[in-house]
Design a protein with these regions (language model features):
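Short, flexible loop segments at boundaries between secondary-structure elements
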Residues: 138-143, 186-223
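Short Gly/Thr/Asp-enriched flexible loops that form oxyanion-binding sites at enzyme active sites
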Residues: 121, 174-183
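Conserved beta-alpha
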Residues: 67-95, 101-155, 159-160
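N-terminal nucleotide/polyanion-binding subdomain common to many enzyme families
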Residues: 1-84
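Short glycine-rich anion-binding loops that position phosphate/pyrophosphate groups of nucleotides
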Residues: 31-34, 168-173, 196
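A short helix->loop->beta-strand "cap" motif at the edges of active sites that frequently abuts
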Residues: 23, 104, 185-189
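Proline-aspartate-enriched helix->loop->beta-strand connector
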Residues: 156-165, 169-170
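A transmembrane-helix-recognition feature enriched in membrane-embedded lipid enzymes
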Residues: 61-62, 206-251
């Protein structure tokens, strides 16, 4: 059974620097993904069995404390925090490599539309000038065919990335990556961070720092897009509280 109490969750942003090198699957969890996982066994398995799970929500941090969970994260680690850390790490490595006459490091963005990916490539050239950027936009459909999956995997292998971002929105991105993990012959960290694609491309604005620092980024998004977000944040947060009460009262 999927339970927050028993999940292993990273404790702080500082711990990102302790992650081992090599093939590593990094997922995020928030109140919405927790609620979704309770109804989706494959998504629950993907979150439970990935290599690293980061608390992308103040609600997760507070809930872990309240229910006495095994993991006690000390702060929220947003998907953007993971992205920022990993991209800067790879930029430094790539700068050192190119200074020695070696090939630049490659970051790959798999997911989203070609329009968004083109914007990502343009901005990455400005912010991370020493990185080589590759992209792949999969077809927009609820389920991929075997041919679609082979094409995605082939594109990833052709890129041979030193860092791979998967952005197809949750839970699709987590389930796809987990289901095809053994088929991916890669050597790098892989992060499932769909919303960050839009943040970095500039098609969606993050909340101002005040909202972020006070754990209110969810409220900012609700106020900006009430018709799209009310179900996720009003109904979803209420359901999350109910689920946490159930966990707290259970043995």
């Amino acid at each position: 059974m999927f339970r927050l109490k028993t999940l292993t969750i990273l404790g702080s942003k500082a711990e990102l620097s302790t992650l081992p090198e090599g093939k590593l699957l990094i997922n995020t969890i928030n109140a919405h993904s927790y609620n979704t996982a309770l109804k989706d066994p494959l998504f629950a398995e993907a979150l439970s069995c990935g290599d690293v799970l980061i608390p992308d929500g103040v609600s997760i941090v507070k809930a872990c404390r309240w229910i006495g969970a095994k993991s006690q994260p000390r702060e929220r680690i947003a998907g953007w925090d993971l992205f920022d850390y990993e991209m800067n790490r790879l930029e430094r490595e790539s700068e050192a490599s190119t200074a020695k006459g070696e090939s630049p490091k490659t970051v790959m963005f798999m997911g989203s539309s070609q329009k968004v990916l083109d914007m990502i490539v343009k901005r990455a050239a400005e912010v991370y000038p020493h990185l080589k950027v590759s992209t792949y936009s999969p077809p927009y459909k609820p389920e991929f065919t075997d041919e679609d999956n082979r094409a995605i995997i082939t594109a990833i292998h052709a890129s041979n990335p030193d860092l791979l971002w998967i952005g197809m929105t949750a839970p699709k991105q987590e389930k796809w990556t987990y289901s095809h993990w053994s088929e991916l012959d890669i050597h790098c960290h892989v992060g499932t961070i769909g919303a960050v694609f839009d943040f970095f491309a500039g098609t969606v604005a993050r909340a101002p720092l005040w909202w972020q620092n006070h754990g209110l980024e969810w409220l900012y998004r609700l106020l900006k897009e009430p018709r799209r977000m009310w179900r996720r944040y009003i109904l979803g947060n209420t359901l999350f509280l109910k689920n946490m009460l159930t966990e707290k009262l259970s043995k």
